[in-house]
């Protein structure tokens, strides 16, 4: 059955967190209760908007396909241009200076209250939760991060996130699920230049100077983006085979801008501008 609940109500169904207003379940704008939709949350590191659907000469056909069948947000911004703070804001609905994640999780920052994380809100509404790969809002210093956050299941480490996510999607599920699939790509270090991306013809992003070194750097970023796209495609193909696609909301985004000067860690459009693509279930015109 297709879920007809508004996206904002699915993501944060009640109250306010840290002064950020959220929909209340009794709000008159909500439709009558329907079968809850699954949520597939796909996220990358340091990608900004440097993918094919945003007009860049970077071959990401799976993300292009997702955009064509979903909705591409051209003016999406993160709440903070650093990894943990951005992710924590998105997943709690509260600003980093309110939720405690004012820096990086592996440098000692943490949420004041992990029960604010979306997995707890969704659990109260009957959801199961699973994490595959990167999370970056809890540290190994405090135990197993997925348990600290409150996920029901941990499926695998970053290098195998797409494989473990595909296995999860192939399982039968009696309850709606929130599946977080986190990728290391396109974080530095880059994997090296792809044969199809000749550095001599890779234009570096402004305001970087156009030099052989910056072209080589951009060529390597493009190779990382190709790898990210292939892994996302693996997950999306698994979703299509699973029978869950017609009742699954797909959210694909990144934490902040690319790891180049005046971008990541900077309050510029290049630092806080992020890709955001959402697809279905139902009611999405596409593009």
Q: What positions do the PLM features span?
A:
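Low-complexity intrinsically disordered segments
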Residues: 2, 13, 31-32, 208
